[in-house]
Amino acid sequence: MAHVNHYDVIVIGSGPGGEGAAMGLTKAGLNVAIVEKESSVGGGCTHWGTIPSKALRHAVSRIIEFNSNPLFCRNNTSLHATFSDILGHAKTVIDKQTRLRQGFYDRNDCTLLFGTARFIDTHSIAVMQNDGTEETYSADKFVIATGSRPYRPSDVDFLHERIYDSDSILSLKHDPRHIIIYGAGVIGCEYASIFRGLGVKTDLINTRDRLLEFLDNEVSDALSYHFWNSGVVIRNDETYEKIEGTEDGVIIHLQSGKKMRADCLLYANGRTGNTDKLSLDVVGLESDSRGQLKVNRNYQTAVEHIYAVGDVIGYPSLASAAYDQGRFVAQAITKGQAENYLIEDIPTGIYTIPEISSVGKTEQELTAAKVPYEVGRSSFKHLARAQIAGKDVGSLKILFHRETKEILGIHCFGERAAEIIHIGQAIMEQKGQANTIEYFVNTTFNYPTMAEAYRVAALNGLNRLF
């Protein structure tokens, strides 16, 4: 008789990657358990990352909209809110998402195991529960989907009450008047938008020479300008020498000799995979210096019955991609190999204020590859829908091949950019001659809409040809 604690597959981690894998496996008829170290499902994406930061950003953008609209803001009075005030909105969304995801497991008869997992042999794990008790479970196969956490350098005192990372910032109790954000990646830039939108004096320290250098240069420059225009102080090419917590704030000493002081500091420079507590050495696996695992096209690690997906395998480290990887690994386990793979051009959504989204090549990449491309642009300020909504900051840029008219890249900066991008992405994904900028000229768009930006940009680009 089969052991009661034995499963076909055990998934470790209930974030997007783990959820995608568990749902795919249970729907294929396998007996699946999923281990979650926290008290509720969803992983870092739901509780500390994507969901709360975007909920905070939405609340702040609505406050900005209210204060900039003369219909609402009269007699020179403005609506003010603190970080603590808007955290309530984020927690409401987190609770809704958690209940929704809990329902997925309940309806699909997927066993939930709460506790911290570690391997004890190649086919068994021990799960340490909150009360200190440990239970052993075995499986034919495992999927590691433990995600990542903020990188914490050893010389920074994260126990100090004024020094935070992107997880602990959600437990911010006081209301700072001045914040230093160290690290100007996606997370750092998003939180810079949030805090500056709340009227908090914000210093953004960038270890690179430009913001989000993987973006198209024009988009990166646009973000830098809007940060500057809103009062964010950006310091590029800087590295900390020492971060010193004081009684009522933080002082950061930079290697360039500069010193800065603020009420608190958010350290947002890098992430590391959650593999250190898995006892990987027991099964013959080893993570790299970033805590990440290497996998093949079927998401198998060096141990063929142990798979890994999501942040724990590195690029692209996106919630959307992690869920797809989870679905693909379910195919690999049930059918011998994955039937689908991540698309080549994965869209990027960055929830700054204004929003940013890109898919495909940048101008600098096309120039370096000597591709004969042309540019089509549409400014939001010229769109009727943007004027009506008072959201006239931003633009859409389409990069296309001069000869074939093939769309090579799309870059959007402004309100709803992450939604707008998918219209162009759908055309880019078409095969052969179906991927053409002329589609947008020959298609009727609703009017007025933000989607009309595609028609305007297409006409603008085609008019440049000769």
Curated annotation (Swiss-Prot):
The UniProt entry's GO biological process terms, in alphabetical order, are: 2-oxoglutarate metabolic process; NADP metabolic process
Protein name according to UniProt: Soluble pyridine nucleotide transhydrogenase
Cofactor(s) this protein requires: FAD
A family per Pfam? Pyr_redox_2
HAMAP family from the entry?
SthA
Subcellular compartments:
Cytoplasm
- Residues that coordinate or bind FAD: 36-45
